[in-house]
Every structure is written in C-alpha cells, then in structure tokens.
C-alpha cells in the first residue's frame, strides 16, 4: 500500500486550502449574481415558467 514518506508542510496545506476556498468563493459569487438577475427579471438568457400553472 502506498504511504507518503514525509509530512506536508503547513505552508503547502495553507496554500492548497486558500486555492480551494478562492474557487468556492468565486462560484458562490457567480451563483448569487445569476440568482439576483433571475429574481429581478433582468436576465434574458434563462427560460423559466412565469406562472405557477405548469400542469398543462
């Protein structure tokens, strides 16, 4: 079974975590921006049901 030979340094751990957190933050900002545009009615590229009667 493969086992790492040495510990990962604290700085490397922090760098990797910072990269992951930055990607997650960017995705959250983009999702929030898209949700805002849909809710305010400014979006022109999303298609969604305008009324609640979808059964027809």
From Swiss-Prot:
It holds the Pfam family Ribosomal_L32p. The gene is rpl32. This is Large ribosomal subunit protein bL32c. The keyword Magnesium does not apply. GO terms for biological process: translation. The lineage of its organism: Eukaryota, Viridiplantae, Streptophyta, Embryophyta, Tracheophyta. It comes from Huperzia lucidula. GO terms for cellular component: chloroplast; large ribosomal subunit. Keywords: Chloroplast, Plastid, Ribonucleoprotein, Ribosomal protein. It comes from the Eukaryota. The keyword Ribosomal protein applies. Belongs to the bacterial ribosomal protein bL32 family. GO terms for molecular function: structural constituent of ribosome. InterPro entries: Ribosomal_bL32, Ribosomal_bL32_plant/cyanobact, Ribosomal_zn-bd. It is found in: Plastid, Chloroplast.
């Amino acid at each position: 079974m493969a086992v790492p030979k040495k510990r990962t340094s604290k700085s490397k751990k922090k760098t990797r975590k910072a990269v992951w957190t930055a990607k997650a933050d960017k995705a959250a900002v983009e999702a929030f921006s898209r949700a805002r545009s849909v809710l305010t009615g400014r979006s022109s590229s999303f298609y969604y049901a305008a009324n609640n009667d979808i059964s027809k």
